[in-house]
């Protein structure tokens, strides 16, 4: 054994190292089993008393992927078209047409949106300059800048927007409290987010998708808004008779402002023929343009986007919905106010220095915000100049509240009210503290795995590993006798090494990762098969067992090493360019290759040398 002293030392050191890294996983699993046997009261008391230990074990334990413990996998895409529009300092009809055409080209082809935008712009007018729309001296874009310089500026801004979005989303997820999230860039404008253990998908969607564009705006002049409402209703009247009927309906709506009337609960003898009144209840007073049921908002938006209808609205006014329902109709559908709000933004969320959840005198949640000195100065001027008027607090283009200013507010404090729950208030605080996304993001792919499905995946994965291990072990013993038993022992150590490597590098075990372990079991046995066959060939030529073992390992090494190193490089490529499940498979495959090479070449050789040289036994390899 002296000749193998170093190998034995390395093997024992690796086993101890694997034991060190796997100990938290084993202890955490036993602790989870213990907690599952406790009652709710006992569990709560135990967690409170041992919170530090439990948290430490959770952080050091081998992590399970979404497919094993449940959670959400979301792919986000940054809206580059919205970023381009925001970067533009001058937007006209030509700009919108070019952007729309570029959007269609980018959606149907391989060209990027920015390249398509520049090409479409130059196709329409080869002599025109993009700098007309994107003049920004601070960024080096002047009216003399070439289209190539503007395109480079847009690409740089798009890349920075994606990177900034990743930072903001990571901060939001951290504040949400997800353990071991995975957030990474995919391609040029996509972001992959994996959130293990989340159980409220809708809340997560709001958290990820919200741009957190907080704005303070003045409301429309009530008289001008209601006059525009009458004009728009008249525009959609099918004939003169219907217009007269609509006038009567509007007069009734103006006179009856009870809650039942506002929520559309008054009886109606027949469905109005006016397409707008069919999906919107006009209020006829104040800053409320109308009341719309949730499912009808898309139809109302389509009717109001008509350019001729937009021209009837007061200049500088747009219509925004309230964030939360104001009631329900007779069918139980949520109803929302459609409000007239000025487009001009008086203050943004950039002046907010602190946000926190508080409760009013009726114990309703609200978000209290504190502004910096500059924001407080503007807020004092804004409130002082608009006493008796509404100021809308707009977050991501929906109105959370529009309080009436009673007096000048010099303290720089404001609040978002009308929230449904503490969780909603906390989510708003989270996005405000994390900052606004540089551009809107869309969820283009979403997968949710429930905890029960994750448990089923764990059971299926363990069953596949144990079944594969048992079948391979039985075959090796049956075919290679003592040599097969040695290979089986090395196989068990191989699995311990794989799990130890994953735990040491803080990797995540996924269902494809378990598939990689099963594949590695076969590859490890394949290496032993090559060695044993070479030993049998040498014995067939009359070599002694000791000489046959030496030559068998020597001749099989090159084939084993070449095959494994090639597979390792393939796994490395998969890890570099893949995402999610592919990376999980690649990680365990690379760990398995390293472990199987060591166990097949080193560990089995130590055991052979011990049995043949030390114990002088005749070991059979079939």
From Swiss-Prot:
Its main location: membrane. GO terms for cellular component: plasma membrane. Keywords: Cell inner membrane, Cell membrane, Membrane, Protein transport, Translocation, Transmembrane, Transmembrane helix, Transport. The chain crosses the membrane at residues 6-26, 460-480, 485-505, 512-532, 559-579, 584-604. It holds the Pfam family SecDF_P1_head. GO terms for biological process: intracellular protein transmembrane transport; protein targeting; protein transport by the Sec complex. It is found in: Cell inner membrane. GO terms for molecular function: protein-transporting ATPase activity. Coiled coil: none annotated. It is a multi-pass membrane protein. Part of the Sec protein translocase complex. Interacts with the SecYEG preprotein conducting channel. SecDF uses the proton motive force (PMF) to complete protein translocation after the ATP-dependent function of SecA. NCBIfam families: 2A0604s01, secD. Belongs to the SecD/SecF family. SecD subfamily. Forms a complex with SecF. Part of the essential Sec protein translocation apparatus which comprises SecA, SecYEG and auxiliary proteins SecDF. Other proteins may also be involved. This is Protein translocase subunit SecD. It comes from Rhodothermus marinus (strain ATCC 43812 / DSM 4252 / R-10). The lineage of its organism: Bacteria, Pseudomonadati, Rhodothermota, Rhodothermia, Rhodothermales. The gene is secD.
């Amino acid at each position: 054994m002296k000749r193998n002293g170093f190998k034995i030392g390395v093997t024992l050191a690796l086993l101890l190292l694997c034991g060190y890294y796997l100990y938290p996983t084993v202890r955490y699993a036993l602790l989870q089993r213990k907690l599952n046997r406790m009652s709710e009261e006992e569990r709560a008391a135990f967690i409170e008393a041992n919170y530090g230990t439990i948290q430490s074990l959770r952080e050091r334990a081998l992590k399970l992927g979404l497919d094993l413990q449940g959670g959400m996998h979301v792919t986000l895409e940054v809206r580059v078209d919205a970023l381009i529009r925001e970067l533009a300092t001058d937007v006209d009809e030509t700009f919108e047409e070019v952007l729309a055409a570029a959007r269609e080209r980018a959606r149907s082809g391989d060209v990027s949106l920015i390249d398509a935008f520049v090409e479409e712009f130059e196709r329409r007018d080869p002599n025109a300059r993009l700098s007309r729309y994107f003049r920004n001296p601070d960024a080096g874009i002047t009216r003399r800048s070439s289209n190539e310089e503007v395109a480079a500026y847009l690409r740089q801004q798009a890349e920075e927007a994606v990177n900034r979005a990743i930072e903001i989303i990571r901060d939001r997820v951290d504040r949400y409290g997800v353990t071991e999230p995975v957030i990474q860039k995919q391609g040029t404008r996509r972001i992959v987010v994996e959130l293990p253990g989340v159980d409220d998908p809708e809340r997560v969607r709001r958290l990820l998708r919200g741009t957190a564009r907080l704005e303070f705006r003045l409301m429309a002049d009530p008289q001008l808004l209601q006059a525009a409402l009458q004009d728009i209703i008249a525009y959609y009247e099918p004939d003169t008779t219907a217009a007269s009927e609509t006038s009567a309906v509007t007069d009734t709506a103006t006179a009856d402002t009870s809650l039942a009337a506002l929520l559309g609960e008054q009886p109606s003898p027949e469905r109005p023929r006016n397409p707008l009144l069919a999906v919107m209840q006009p209020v006829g007073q104040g800053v409320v343009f109308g009341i719309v049921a949730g499912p009808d908002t898309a139809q109302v938006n389509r009717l109001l986007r008509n350019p001729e209808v937009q021209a009837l609205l007061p200049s500088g006014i747009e219509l925004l919905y309230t964030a939360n329902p104001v009631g329900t109709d007779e069918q139980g559908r949520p109803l929302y106010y459609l409000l007239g709000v000025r487009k001009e933004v008086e203050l943004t969320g950039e002046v907010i220095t602190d946000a926190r959840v508080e409760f009013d005198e009726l114990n309703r949640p609200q978000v209290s915000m504190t502004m910096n000195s500059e924001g407080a100065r503007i807020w004092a001027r804004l409130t002082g100049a608009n006493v008796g008027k509404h100021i809308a607090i707009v977050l991501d283009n929906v109105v959370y509240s529009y309080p009436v200013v009673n007096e000048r507010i010099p303290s720089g404090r404001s609040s978002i009210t009308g929230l449904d729950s503490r969780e909603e208030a906390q989510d708003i605080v989270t996005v405000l503290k994390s900052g606004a996304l540089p551009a809107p993001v869309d969820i283009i792919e979403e997968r949710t795995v429930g905890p029960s499905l994750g448990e089923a995946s764990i059971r299926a994965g363990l069953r596949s590993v144990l079944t594969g291990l048992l079948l391979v072990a039985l075959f090796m013993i049956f075919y290679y006798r003592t040599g097969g038993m040695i290979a089986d022992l090395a196989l068990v150590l191989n699995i311990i090494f794989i799990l130890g490597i994953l735990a040491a590098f803080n990797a995540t075990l996924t269902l494809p990762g378990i598939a990689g372990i099963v594949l590695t079991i076969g590859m490890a046995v394949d290496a032993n098969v090559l060695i044993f066959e070479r030993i049998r060939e040498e014995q067939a030529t009359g070599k002694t067992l000791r000489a046959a073992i030496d030559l068998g390992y020597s001749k099989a090494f090159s084939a084993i090493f070449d095959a494994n190193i090639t597979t390792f490089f393939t796994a490395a490529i998969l890890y570099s360019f893949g995402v999610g499940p592919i990376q999980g498979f690649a990680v365990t495959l690379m760990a398995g290759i390293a472990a199987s090479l060591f166990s097949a070449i080193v560990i089995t050789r130590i055991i052979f040398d011990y049995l043949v040289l030390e114990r002088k036994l005749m070991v059979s390899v079939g």
